[in-house]
């Protein structure tokens, strides 16, 4: 039976999930998880406590409980359950209070809510990424923080959206298609913003597999075409001295982190 895991918060539960997933990924096990956000009242906390206790009674095993709860009275109710508690906020807050000589002043939703100064930057960046996805328009390239280039299905769109959502970076992306291969060159709008360009490439066999799932047995998905496009685009990256990375078998989180590392782009918000 898969171990049971609860992610609980009086906010979005994003922090609890991120930390919990990071810890549990170290173990070669499958976990059955339940995320419960916005536990903001004593009544909700008591209900969550009952769920945790019911899980313990049913399985005979104490469920893992990862939580990031600001309100002490809510936190105490969760502490009193039969779960095995991992409290991320208090684990770090108490030692920091001692080191800094300042008492924490917890504010609910400060990390992810509108009170966060980066909220507007995040929304603007997300809108920018969607409006400038896949070369839909070249009008706003001057406003971009970053312009991702590459063949179709190499990871440009998810990387652009992730960078905008997580870091408030205005990321546009532009695809090179099979029609470009005979005379592959940078459009003028990209030449004007050459310092913002960053390339993504991918193993042709992996690209073939991805395209096959979308357009099976087409020229677009053929291994020959995939090899041609990857080769031509990589040659152009080298010719134009555009930095690039290989996205093969990397998660969007890893791709985004590598892009930030290579470019030195400042994260606009955390």
Curated annotation (Swiss-Prot):
GO terms for molecular function: ADP binding; ATP binding; phosphotransferase activity, phosphate group as acceptor; protein serine/threonine kinase activity. It comes from the Bacteria. ADP binds at residues 150-157. Keywords: Kinase, Nucleotide-binding, Serine/threonine-protein kinase, Transferase. InterPro entries: Kinase-pyrophosphorylase, PSRP. It is an enzyme of class 2 (transferase). Its EC number is 2.7.11.33, 2.7.4.28. This is Putative phosphoenolpyruvate synthase regulatory protein.
């Amino acid at each position: 039976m898969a171990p049971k895991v609860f992610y609980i918060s009086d906010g979005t539960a994003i922090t609890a999930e991120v930390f919990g997933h990071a810890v549990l990924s170290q173990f070669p096990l499958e976990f059955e998880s339940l995320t419960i956000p916005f536990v903001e009242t004593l009544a909700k906390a008591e209900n969550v406590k009952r769920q945790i206790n019911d899980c313990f009674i049913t399985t005979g095993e104490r469920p893992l409980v990862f939580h990031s709860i600001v309100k002490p009275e809510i936190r105490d109710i969760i502490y009193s359950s039969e779960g095995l508690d991992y409290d991320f906020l208090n684990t770090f807050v108490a030692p920091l209070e001692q080191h800094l000589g300042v008492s924490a002043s917890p504010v609910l939703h400060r990390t992810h809510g509108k009170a966060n100064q980066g909220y507007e930057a995040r929304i603007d960046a997300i809108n920018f990424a969607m409006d400038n996805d896949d070369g839909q328009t070249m009008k706003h390239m001057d406003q971009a923080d970053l312009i991702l280039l590459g063949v179709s299905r190499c990871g440009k769109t998810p990387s652009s959206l992730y960078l905008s959502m997580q870091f408030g970076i205005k990321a546009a992306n532009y695809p090179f298609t099979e029609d470009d291969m005979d005379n592959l060159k940078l459009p003028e709008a990209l030449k004007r913003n050459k310092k913002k360009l960053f390339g993504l490439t991918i193993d042709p066999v992996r690209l073939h597999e991805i395209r096959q799932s979308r357009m099976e047995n087409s020229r677009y998905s053929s291994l020959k075409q995939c090899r041609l496009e990857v080769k031509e685009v990589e040659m152009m990256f080298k010719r134009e001295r555009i930095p690039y990375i290989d996205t093969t078998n990397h998660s969007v989180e890893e791709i985004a982190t590598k892009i930030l590392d290579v470019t030195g782009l400042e994260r606009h918000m955390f």
